[in-house]
């Protein structure tokens, strides 16, 4: 099993448990150059809020989009957008990525901005 297949297996297991709970989830995906965050409805078919380092407004604020500072900006923005829509509590779905570095920075920034998980 290669590295990507193992990550997808971990993500699938976690998502199955979150779907059983019927929780709104904050999903994070990272690539070497960008980080993406989405708040997905409990049924899993609707994206309620999204933010990523590919957005023009976010790119203008940053020197580099593949670091912890960029992840923190995305976390803050996705939390603000979720709170505007009335979403206060979510479950964190790290998509099989280790809770470390950019994923942790995004989560911490979202918590500081008022999102609960």
Swiss-Prot record:
Keywords: Ribonucleoprotein, Ribosomal protein, RNA-binding, rRNA-binding. GO terms for biological process: translation. GO terms for cellular component: cytosolic large ribosomal subunit. The keyword Ribosomal protein applies. GO terms for molecular function: 5S rRNA binding; structural constituent of ribosome. It holds the Pfam family Ribosomal_L18p. This is one of the proteins that bind and probably mediate the attachment of the 5S RNA into the large ribosomal subunit, where it forms part of the central protuberance. NCBIfam families: L18_bact (TIGR00060). This is Large ribosomal subunit protein uL18. It comes from Proteus mirabilis (strain HI4320). The lineage of its organism: Bacteria, Pseudomonadati, Pseudomonadota, Gammaproteobacteria, Enterobacterales.
């Amino acid at each position: 099993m290669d590295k990507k297949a193992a990550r997808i297996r971990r993500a699938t297991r976690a998502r199955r448990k979150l779907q059983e709970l019927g929780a709104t989830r904050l999903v994070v995906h990272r690539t070497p150059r960008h980080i993406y965050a989405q708040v997905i409805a409990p049924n899993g078919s609707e994206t309620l809020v999204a933010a990523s380092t590919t957005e023009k407004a976010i790119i203008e604020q940053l020197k580099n989009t593949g670091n912890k500072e960029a992840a923190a900006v995305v976390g803050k923005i996705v939390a603000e957008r979720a709170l505007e829509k009335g979403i206060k509590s979510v479950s964190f779905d790290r998509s099989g990525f280790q809770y470390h570095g950019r994923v942790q920075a995004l989560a911490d920034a979202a918590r500081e901005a008022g999102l609960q998980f």
